[in-house]
Amino acid sequence: MCIEAMRTSRASRETAKVLQALSPPARRQTRSTSHSALLKGFAYNAGKTEADPDDGEDDGSSLTSVDTVDIEDILEPSAKRRKTKASSAAKTTSNSTRRTPEKKVEKLVKKENSQPKARRVPARKVKNEDGSFTVEAPSNWDAIYSIVKKMREDNPTAPVDTMGCAELYWRASSPRDRRFQTLIALMLSSQTKDTVTAVAMQRLHTELGEGGAPAIKLETEHAESIVKQEAENGEPAIKQEAKDGVPPANPSHDSTLNLENILAVSPERLNSLIGTVGFHNNKTKYIKKAAEIIRDQYNSDIPSTPAELMKLPGVGPKMAYLCMSAAWGKHEGIGVDVHVHRITNLWGWHKTKTPEETRMSLESWLPKDKWHEINKLLVGLGQTVCLPVGRRCGDCGLAGTKLCKSEIKGMAPKNNGRGLPKKEIVVETFSLTGEPKIKVEGE
Protein backbone atom coordinates (compact mmCIF):
# COMPACT_ATOMS: atom_id res chain seq x y z
CA MET A 1 0.00 0.00 0.00
CA CYS A 2 2.69 2.46 0.87
CA ILE A 3 4.67 1.63 -2.20
CA GLU A 4 1.62 2.15 -4.44
CA ALA A 5 0.75 5.44 -2.73
CA MET A 6 4.27 6.75 -3.26
CA ARG A 7 4.13 5.75 -6.90
CA THR A 8 0.76 7.49 -7.31
CA SER A 9 1.97 10.75 -5.68
CA ARG A 10 5.13 10.72 -7.80
CA ALA A 11 3.10 10.20 -10.94
CA SER A 12 0.73 12.98 -9.99
CA ARG A 13 3.61 15.35 -9.39
CA GLU A 14 5.16 14.56 -12.75
CA THR A 15 1.79 14.95 -14.42
CA ALA A 16 1.35 18.34 -12.74
CA LYS A 17 4.78 19.41 -13.95
CA VAL A 18 3.94 18.41 -17.51
CA LEU A 19 0.61 20.23 -17.40
CA GLN A 20 2.25 23.29 -15.89
CA ALA A 21 4.82 23.29 -18.66
CA LEU A 22 2.18 22.94 -21.35
CA SER A 23 -0.26 25.56 -19.94
CA PRO A 24 0.33 29.35 -20.73
CA PRO A 25 1.82 31.50 -17.99
CA ALA A 26 -0.62 33.22 -15.70
CA ARG A 27 -1.37 36.91 -16.65
CA ARG A 28 0.10 39.50 -14.33
CA GLN A 29 -2.47 41.26 -12.23
CA THR A 30 -2.05 45.10 -12.30
CA ARG A 31 -3.94 47.99 -10.76
CA SER A 32 -5.56 48.94 -14.05
CA THR A 33 -6.74 45.41 -14.76
CA SER A 34 -8.19 45.11 -11.30
CA HIS A 35 -10.06 48.42 -11.72
CA SER A 36 -11.28 47.31 -15.11
CA ALA A 37 -12.55 44.06 -13.73
CA LEU A 38 -14.27 45.93 -10.94
CA LEU A 39 -15.91 48.35 -13.36
CA LYS A 40 -16.97 45.46 -15.55
CA GLY A 41 -18.84 44.01 -12.65
CA PHE A 42 -20.88 47.22 -12.31
CA ALA A 43 -21.69 47.43 -16.03
CA TYR A 44 -25.30 47.99 -17.13
CA ASN A 45 -25.61 44.56 -18.78
CA ALA A 46 -23.57 42.69 -16.22
CA GLY A 47 -26.59 40.77 -14.92
CA LYS A 48 -27.78 39.71 -18.35
CA THR A 49 -24.46 38.23 -19.44
CA GLU A 50 -24.27 34.49 -19.15
CA ALA A 51 -21.36 33.08 -17.28
CA ASP A 52 -18.82 31.36 -19.42
CA PRO A 53 -17.95 27.97 -18.02
CA ASP A 54 -14.33 28.51 -18.91
CA ASP A 55 -14.04 31.85 -17.05
CA GLY A 56 -12.69 30.27 -13.99
CA GLU A 57 -10.09 28.34 -15.88
CA ASP A 58 -8.93 31.10 -18.27
CA ASP A 59 -8.73 34.54 -16.65
CA GLY A 60 -7.08 36.16 -19.68
CA SER A 61 -10.16 35.81 -21.91
CA SER A 62 -12.30 37.88 -19.56
CA LEU A 63 -9.79 40.74 -19.42
CA THR A 64 -9.53 41.11 -23.17
CA SER A 65 -13.21 42.12 -23.42
CA VAL A 66 -12.58 45.42 -21.61
CA ASP A 67 -11.38 48.39 -23.77
CA THR A 68 -7.90 49.60 -22.87
CA VAL A 69 -8.62 53.27 -22.22
CA ASP A 70 -7.37 55.70 -19.60
CA ILE A 71 -9.13 55.90 -16.28
CA GLU A 72 -9.80 59.61 -16.69
CA ASP A 73 -11.84 58.83 -19.77
CA ILE A 74 -13.89 56.17 -18.03
CA LEU A 75 -14.56 57.85 -14.71
CA GLU A 76 -16.79 60.92 -14.66
CA PRO A 77 -15.49 63.94 -12.73
CA SER A 78 -16.77 64.61 -9.29
CA ALA A 79 -19.79 66.79 -8.80
CA LYS A 80 -17.74 69.73 -7.50
CA ARG A 81 -15.31 69.74 -10.41
CA ARG A 82 -18.12 69.31 -12.90
CA LYS A 83 -19.95 72.25 -11.37
CA THR A 84 -16.83 74.44 -11.42
CA LYS A 85 -16.09 73.66 -15.05
CA ALA A 86 -19.66 74.24 -16.07
CA SER A 87 -19.82 77.58 -14.26
CA SER A 88 -16.50 78.75 -15.75
CA ALA A 89 -17.62 77.72 -19.22
CA ALA A 90 -20.91 79.54 -18.73
CA LYS A 91 -19.07 82.60 -17.40
CA THR A 92 -16.71 82.61 -20.38
CA THR A 93 -19.60 82.24 -22.77
CA SER A 94 -21.58 84.98 -21.05
CA ASN A 95 -18.56 87.30 -20.98
CA SER A 96 -17.81 86.73 -24.63
CA THR A 97 -21.42 87.25 -25.60
CA ARG A 98 -21.62 90.35 -23.41
CA ARG A 99 -18.40 92.03 -24.66
CA THR A 100 -18.70 91.35 -28.35
CA PRO A 101 -21.79 93.47 -29.00
CA GLU A 102 -20.31 96.31 -26.88
CA LYS A 103 -17.23 96.45 -29.10
CA LYS A 104 -19.34 96.39 -32.21
CA VAL A 105 -21.54 99.17 -30.87
CA GLU A 106 -18.49 101.30 -30.02
CA LYS A 107 -17.08 100.82 -33.49
CA LEU A 108 -20.38 101.72 -35.07
CA VAL A 109 -20.68 104.85 -32.92
CA LYS A 110 -17.16 105.92 -33.83
CA LYS A 111 -17.88 105.45 -37.51
CA GLU A 112 -21.06 107.47 -37.25
CA ASN A 113 -19.53 110.34 -35.25
CA SER A 114 -16.19 110.54 -37.08
CA GLN A 115 -16.04 113.07 -39.91
CA PRO A 116 -13.59 112.67 -42.76
CA LYS A 117 -10.61 114.91 -42.07
CA ALA A 118 -9.23 116.98 -44.90
CA ARG A 119 -5.85 115.56 -45.69
CA ARG A 120 -3.05 118.13 -45.91
CA VAL A 121 -1.19 117.36 -49.11
CA PRO A 122 2.01 119.17 -50.17
CA ALA A 123 2.86 120.11 -53.72
CA ARG A 124 3.34 116.99 -55.82
CA LYS A 125 3.98 115.89 -59.38
CA VAL A 126 1.12 114.32 -61.32
CA LYS A 127 1.67 112.38 -64.54
CA ASN A 128 -0.66 113.31 -67.38
CA GLU A 129 -2.07 110.97 -70.01
CA ASP A 130 0.45 112.14 -72.60
CA GLY A 131 3.34 111.26 -70.27
CA SER A 132 4.13 114.83 -69.20
CA PHE A 133 4.14 115.96 -65.59
CA THR A 134 2.36 118.83 -63.90
CA VAL A 135 2.75 120.02 -60.32
CA GLU A 136 -0.38 120.29 -58.22
CA ALA A 137 -0.48 123.05 -55.63
CA PRO A 138 -0.63 122.17 -51.92
CA SER A 139 -4.07 121.76 -50.43
CA ASN A 140 -5.57 124.94 -48.91
CA TRP A 141 -2.61 127.08 -50.01
CA ASP A 142 -4.91 129.81 -51.32
CA ALA A 143 -6.76 130.04 -48.01
CA ILE A 144 -3.48 130.38 -46.12
CA TYR A 145 -2.18 132.97 -48.58
CA SER A 146 -5.35 135.08 -48.40
CA ILE A 147 -5.42 135.13 -44.59
CA VAL A 148 -1.75 136.07 -44.29
CA LYS A 149 -2.03 138.76 -46.96
CA LYS A 150 -5.03 140.34 -45.22
CA MET A 151 -3.22 140.21 -41.88
CA ARG A 152 -0.12 141.88 -43.33
CA GLU A 153 -2.13 144.58 -45.09
CA ASP A 154 -4.00 145.43 -41.89
CA ASN A 155 -0.82 145.76 -39.85
CA PRO A 156 2.23 146.70 -41.96
CA THR A 157 4.64 147.12 -39.05
CA ALA A 158 7.46 144.84 -40.20
CA PRO A 159 10.88 146.38 -40.89
CA VAL A 160 10.72 145.11 -44.47
CA ASP A 161 7.64 147.25 -45.10
CA THR A 162 9.61 150.47 -44.76
CA MET A 163 13.26 149.47 -44.74
CA GLY A 164 13.37 146.65 -47.24
CA CYS A 165 15.95 146.77 -50.02
CA ALA A 166 13.31 147.86 -52.53
CA GLU A 167 12.68 151.00 -50.42
CA LEU A 168 16.27 152.18 -49.92
CA TYR A 169 16.96 153.89 -53.25
CA TRP A 170 17.25 157.69 -53.42
CA ARG A 171 14.00 159.07 -54.79
CA ALA A 172 15.63 161.94 -56.67
CA SER A 173 18.31 159.90 -58.43
CA SER A 174 18.25 158.92 -62.08
CA PRO A 175 16.71 155.55 -63.06
CA ARG A 176 20.17 154.17 -63.75
CA ASP A 177 21.47 155.24 -60.33
CA ARG A 178 18.35 153.95 -58.59
CA ARG A 179 18.86 150.53 -60.13
CA PHE A 180 22.47 150.57 -58.96
CA GLN A 181 21.43 151.65 -55.46
CA THR A 182 18.91 148.79 -55.27
CA LEU A 183 21.63 146.31 -56.23
CA ILE A 184 23.99 147.70 -53.57
CA ALA A 185 21.24 147.51 -50.93
CA LEU A 186 20.66 143.85 -51.77
CA MET A 187 24.36 143.06 -51.58
CA LEU A 188 24.56 144.71 -48.15
CA SER A 189 21.43 142.96 -46.84
CA SER A 190 22.89 139.45 -46.79
CA GLN A 191 23.13 138.20 -43.18
CA THR A 192 22.08 141.67 -41.97
CA LYS A 193 18.91 143.07 -40.44
CA ASP A 194 16.91 145.55 -42.48
CA THR A 195 17.41 148.30 -39.89
CA VAL A 196 21.19 147.93 -40.06
CA THR A 197 21.14 147.85 -43.86
CA ALA A 198 19.10 151.05 -43.92
CA VAL A 199 21.66 152.86 -41.75
CA ALA A 200 24.56 151.74 -43.97
CA MET A 201 22.69 152.81 -47.10
CA GLN A 202 22.01 156.20 -45.58
CA ARG A 203 25.73 156.73 -45.03
CA LEU A 204 26.45 155.79 -48.63
CA HIS A 205 23.75 158.17 -49.83
CA THR A 206 25.24 161.11 -47.94
CA GLU A 207 28.93 160.47 -47.20
CA LEU A 208 30.36 158.51 -50.10
CA GLY A 209 31.42 161.39 -52.37
CA GLU A 210 34.30 163.73 -51.57
CA GLY A 211 33.74 167.48 -51.44
CA GLY A 212 29.98 167.30 -50.93
CA ALA A 213 27.14 165.76 -52.91
CA PRO A 214 26.42 166.87 -56.46
CA ALA A 215 23.43 168.99 -57.31
CA ILE A 216 20.12 167.22 -57.59
CA LYS A 217 19.07 165.86 -60.96
CA LEU A 218 15.56 167.05 -61.74
CA GLU A 219 13.98 164.55 -64.10
CA THR A 220 10.26 164.90 -63.54
CA GLU A 221 7.74 167.66 -64.00
CA HIS A 222 6.77 167.26 -60.36
CA ALA A 223 10.31 168.08 -59.22
CA GLU A 224 10.45 171.12 -61.49
CA SER A 225 7.14 172.41 -60.12
CA ILE A 226 8.44 172.09 -56.56
CA VAL A 227 11.57 174.10 -57.37
CA LYS A 228 9.50 176.75 -59.20
CA GLN A 229 7.18 177.09 -56.22
CA GLU A 230 10.15 177.47 -53.88
CA ALA A 231 11.61 180.22 -56.08
CA GLU A 232 8.35 182.16 -56.15
CA ASN A 233 7.66 181.96 -52.42
CA GLY A 234 11.23 182.27 -51.28
CA GLU A 235 10.85 179.26 -49.02
CA PRO A 236 10.59 175.50 -49.38
CA ALA A 237 7.26 174.25 -50.65
CA ILE A 238 7.06 171.81 -47.74
CA LYS A 239 8.32 173.05 -44.42
CA GLN A 240 10.48 170.70 -42.42
CA GLU A 241 11.05 170.66 -38.71
CA ALA A 242 14.13 169.51 -36.91
CA LYS A 243 13.73 166.21 -35.08
CA ASP A 244 15.78 165.54 -31.95
CA GLY A 245 18.04 168.51 -32.74
CA VAL A 246 18.93 167.15 -36.21
CA PRO A 247 18.18 169.64 -39.00
CA PRO A 248 16.15 168.33 -41.94
CA ALA A 249 17.88 167.23 -45.09
CA ASN A 250 18.53 169.62 -47.92
CA PRO A 251 16.56 168.36 -50.94
CA SER A 252 18.79 170.28 -53.34
CA HIS A 253 21.42 167.54 -53.31
CA ASP A 254 21.44 164.16 -54.98
CA SER A 255 22.67 160.93 -53.47
CA THR A 256 26.38 160.30 -53.41
CA LEU A 257 25.79 156.60 -54.05
CA ASN A 258 26.40 155.97 -57.74
CA LEU A 259 28.68 153.85 -59.89
CA GLU A 260 31.28 156.55 -60.40
CA ASN A 261 31.72 157.25 -56.69
CA ILE A 262 31.95 153.54 -55.87
CA LEU A 263 34.73 153.20 -58.44
CA ALA A 264 36.54 156.25 -57.07
CA VAL A 265 36.30 155.53 -53.34
CA SER A 266 39.09 153.63 -51.64
CA PRO A 267 38.31 150.17 -50.23
CA GLU A 268 39.21 151.37 -46.73
CA ARG A 269 36.78 154.27 -46.91
CA LEU A 270 34.00 152.10 -48.32
CA ASN A 271 34.62 149.49 -45.65
CA SER A 272 34.30 152.09 -42.89
CA LEU A 273 30.99 153.35 -44.30
CA ILE A 274 29.40 149.90 -44.37
CA GLY A 275 31.13 148.60 -41.24
CA THR A 276 27.84 147.94 -39.43
CA VAL A 277 26.64 145.22 -41.82
CA GLY A 278 27.57 141.58 -41.57
CA PHE A 279 30.68 140.38 -43.44
CA HIS A 280 31.49 143.97 -44.44
CA ASN A 281 35.07 143.08 -45.43
CA ASN A 282 33.91 140.62 -48.07
CA LYS A 283 31.10 142.89 -49.20
CA THR A 284 33.58 145.73 -49.78
CA LYS A 285 35.52 143.51 -52.19
CA TYR A 286 32.35 142.31 -53.91
CA ILE A 287 30.98 145.83 -54.41
CA LYS A 288 34.24 147.18 -55.83
CA LYS A 289 34.61 144.22 -58.20
CA ALA A 290 30.96 144.34 -59.29
CA ALA A 291 31.27 148.06 -60.08
CA GLU A 292 34.21 147.38 -62.39
CA ILE A 293 32.30 144.60 -64.19
CA ILE A 294 29.24 146.84 -64.64
CA ARG A 295 31.41 149.62 -66.06
CA ASP A 296 33.39 147.38 -68.42
CA GLN A 297 30.77 144.87 -69.58
CA TYR A 298 27.34 146.44 -69.15
CA ASN A 299 27.77 150.08 -70.20
CA SER A 300 27.73 151.37 -66.59
CA ASP A 301 24.24 149.94 -65.88
CA ILE A 302 23.35 146.84 -63.94
CA PRO A 303 22.63 143.64 -65.94
CA SER A 304 19.02 143.16 -67.05
CA THR A 305 18.73 139.37 -66.73
CA PRO A 306 18.95 137.08 -63.70
CA ALA A 307 21.71 135.01 -65.28
CA GLU A 308 23.87 138.09 -65.91
CA LEU A 309 23.22 139.45 -62.43
CA MET A 310 24.34 136.17 -60.89
CA LYS A 311 27.69 136.55 -62.65
CA LEU A 312 28.47 139.47 -60.35
CA PRO A 313 30.47 138.55 -57.22
CA GLY A 314 28.33 138.14 -54.12
CA VAL A 315 25.04 137.96 -56.05
CA GLY A 316 23.00 134.75 -55.82
CA PRO A 317 19.56 133.70 -57.07
CA LYS A 318 17.68 135.46 -54.27
CA MET A 319 19.37 138.82 -54.91
CA ALA A 320 19.12 138.43 -58.67
CA TYR A 321 15.37 137.82 -58.74
CA LEU A 322 14.64 140.50 -56.14
CA CYS A 323 16.77 142.96 -58.09
CA MET A 324 14.95 142.11 -61.32
CA SER A 325 11.61 142.88 -59.64
CA ALA A 326 12.64 146.03 -57.76
CA ALA A 327 15.05 147.57 -60.29
CA TRP A 328 13.71 146.45 -63.68
CA GLY A 329 10.09 145.65 -62.83
CA LYS A 330 10.46 142.14 -64.29
CA HIS A 331 9.20 139.26 -62.18
CA GLU A 332 11.10 136.32 -63.61
CA GLY A 333 11.58 134.36 -60.41
CA ILE A 334 10.87 134.27 -56.69
CA GLY A 335 13.35 135.72 -54.24
CA VAL A 336 13.52 133.12 -51.47
CA ASP A 337 15.32 134.03 -48.28
CA VAL A 338 15.43 132.20 -44.95
CA HIS A 339 11.97 133.46 -43.92
CA VAL A 340 10.24 132.25 -47.09
CA HIS A 341 12.09 128.94 -46.92
CA ARG A 342 11.28 128.38 -43.25
CA ILE A 343 7.62 129.44 -43.24
CA THR A 344 6.56 127.55 -46.36
CA ASN A 345 8.07 124.39 -44.89
CA LEU A 346 6.24 125.03 -41.61
CA TRP A 347 2.99 125.23 -43.59
CA GLY A 348 3.72 121.89 -45.21
CA TRP A 349 3.79 123.26 -48.76
CA HIS A 350 6.90 121.21 -49.47
CA LYS A 351 9.83 119.47 -47.80
CA THR A 352 12.93 121.28 -49.00
CA LYS A 353 16.38 121.61 -47.49
CA THR A 354 17.68 124.82 -49.11
CA PRO A 355 16.17 128.15 -50.22
CA GLU A 356 17.05 127.29 -53.81
CA GLU A 357 15.01 124.07 -53.62
CA THR A 358 12.16 126.10 -52.14
CA ARG A 359 12.34 128.59 -55.02
CA MET A 360 12.11 125.86 -57.65
CA SER A 361 9.24 124.20 -55.80
CA LEU A 362 7.26 127.43 -55.48
CA GLU A 363 7.82 128.45 -59.08
CA SER A 364 6.46 125.09 -60.25
CA TRP A 365 2.91 125.81 -59.02
CA LEU A 366 2.52 129.31 -57.50
CA PRO A 367 0.70 131.71 -59.87
CA LYS A 368 3.14 134.11 -61.46
CA ASP A 369 1.25 137.21 -60.34
CA LYS A 370 2.29 136.35 -56.77
CA TRP A 371 5.98 135.87 -57.44
CA HIS A 372 6.83 139.48 -56.64
CA GLU A 373 4.80 139.98 -53.47
CA ILE A 374 5.35 136.67 -51.70
CA ASN A 375 8.84 137.63 -50.53
CA LYS A 376 7.78 140.81 -48.77
CA LEU A 377 4.65 139.08 -47.48
CA LEU A 378 6.45 136.22 -45.76
CA VAL A 379 9.52 138.18 -44.70
CA GLY A 380 7.25 140.57 -42.82
CA LEU A 381 5.39 137.65 -41.26
CA GLY A 382 8.69 136.12 -40.18
CA GLN A 383 9.87 139.40 -38.66
CA THR A 384 6.76 140.08 -36.58
CA VAL A 385 4.77 136.90 -35.82
CA CYS A 386 6.30 133.69 -37.17
CA LEU A 387 9.69 134.34 -35.63
CA PRO A 388 12.62 131.93 -36.06
CA VAL A 389 12.70 131.49 -32.27
CA GLY A 390 9.58 131.88 -30.14
CA ARG A 391 6.80 131.89 -32.71
CA ARG A 392 3.76 133.98 -31.72
CA CYS A 393 1.06 131.68 -33.03
CA GLY A 394 -1.56 133.42 -30.91
CA ASP A 395 -1.04 136.64 -32.90
CA CYS A 396 -1.29 134.90 -36.28
CA GLY A 397 -4.43 135.01 -38.39
CA LEU A 398 -4.06 131.28 -39.02
CA ALA A 399 -4.49 130.45 -35.32
CA GLY A 400 -7.39 128.05 -34.79
CA THR A 401 -8.05 127.50 -38.50
CA LYS A 402 -6.19 124.15 -38.64
CA LEU A 403 -4.49 125.38 -41.80
CA CYS A 404 -0.99 125.65 -40.35
CA LYS A 405 0.39 122.20 -39.56
CA SER A 406 3.05 123.67 -37.26
CA GLU A 407 0.75 125.81 -35.12
CA ILE A 408 1.57 125.83 -31.42
CA LYS A 409 -1.93 125.45 -30.01
CA GLY A 410 -3.12 127.17 -26.88
CA MET A 411 -0.95 130.28 -27.20
CA ALA A 412 -2.73 133.49 -26.21
CA PRO A 413 -2.16 136.68 -28.24
CA LYS A 414 0.67 138.72 -26.77
CA ASN A 415 -0.64 142.02 -28.08
CA ASN A 416 -4.41 141.43 -28.22
CA GLY A 417 -4.14 140.31 -31.82
CA ARG A 418 -2.99 143.71 -33.04
CA GLY A 419 0.50 142.62 -34.01
CA LEU A 420 3.59 144.15 -32.49
CA PRO A 421 3.93 147.55 -30.83
CA LYS A 422 5.25 150.23 -33.11
CA LYS A 423 8.54 151.96 -32.61
CA GLU A 424 9.29 154.96 -34.77
CA ILE A 425 12.77 155.30 -36.20
CA VAL A 426 13.73 158.27 -38.36
CA VAL A 427 15.88 157.27 -41.29
CA GLU A 428 16.56 160.03 -43.80
CA THR A 429 16.05 158.53 -47.25
CA PHE A 430 15.07 161.93 -48.59
CA SER A 431 12.45 162.00 -51.30
CA LEU A 432 12.04 164.82 -53.81
CA THR A 433 10.00 166.76 -51.27
CA GLY A 434 12.81 166.58 -48.74
CA GLU A 435 10.71 164.86 -46.07
CA PRO A 436 12.58 162.26 -44.07
CA LYS A 437 10.69 158.99 -44.18
CA ILE A 438 9.43 157.64 -40.87
CA LYS A 439 10.47 154.05 -40.52
CA VAL A 440 8.47 151.71 -38.31
CA GLU A 441 10.16 148.80 -36.61
CA GLY A 442 8.30 146.12 -34.68
CA GLU A 443 9.84 145.30 -31.34
Curated annotation (Swiss-Prot):
Residues 86-98 have a biased composition (Low complexity). The record marks D337 as: Important for catalytic activity. This is Endonuclease III homolog. The active site is at K318 (nucleophile). Residues 1-40 form a transit peptide. SUPFAM superfamilies: DNA-glycosylase. GO terms for biological process: base-excision repair, AP site formation; nucleotide-excision repair. Residues 297-321 form the HhH domain. It comes from Emericella nidulans (strain FGSC A4 / ATCC 38163 / CBS 112.46 / NRRL 194 / M139) (Aspergillus nidulans). Belongs to the Nth/MutY family.
